Amino acid sequence: MPFITIKTSGKALGPAEIQTLHQETTALMAEVMGKKAEVTAVLVEDAPASHWSVGGRALAGSGGVTAHADIKITQGTNTATEKAAMIAATRDMLLRVLPDLSTVAYVVIDEIPATDWSYGGLTQAERKRRADAA
């Protein structure tokens, strides 16, 4: 049940680009991280360039394009190799959608303890406990 937020700034994304980010991110989570596509959520948000700064300077007026992808997964469910591959693949995907992407763009994988987030009202720890008991 991964949740991925992709924030972009410096270029307004059209519906096709947003759909590409939704579909490709979901596919990468399945192929690279082994996550179920049907429970992978992706939120794409656009931040005004005046709200985003790099080096203390607002992106507005600089012509720069940047992004931040925050991938939330359950702690301990992926290896360091899988996470490194996902970070690289996500960066490549962002470059395909945003060819002028700055090097100052980030992909972060947050590992959330199974006791600290839920899907369908049950924590991941409780889901595992119930599955193990069945």
List each language-model region with its residue ranges.
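A domain-level signal for the structural core that forms small-molecule/cofactor-binding pockets
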Residues: 1-134
